[in-house]
């Protein structure tokens, strides 16, 4: 559960970062 949650969080975090980066850039 912890590993799966970490993977999901990493994917979501990467998506948010790339979206924020695109918007900022």
Curated annotation (Swiss-Prot):
UniProt-listed InterPro entries: Peptidase_S1_PA_chymotrypsin
GTP-binding in keyword set: no
Keywords, in A-Z order: Hydrolase, Protease, Serine protease, Zymogen
Gene Ontology biological process terms in this record: proteolysis
Gene3D superfamilies for the chain: Trypsin-like serine proteases (2.40.10.10)
The keyword NAD is annotated on this UniProt entry: no
The protein's name in its UniProt record: Alpha-lytic protease
Species of the source: Achromobacter lyticus
Record lineage: Bacteria, Pseudomonadati, Pseudomonadota, Betaproteobacteria, Burkholderiales
């Amino acid at each position: 559960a912890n590993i799966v949650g970490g993977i999901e969080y990493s994917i979501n975090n990467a998506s948010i970062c790339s979206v924020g980066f695109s918007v900022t850039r």
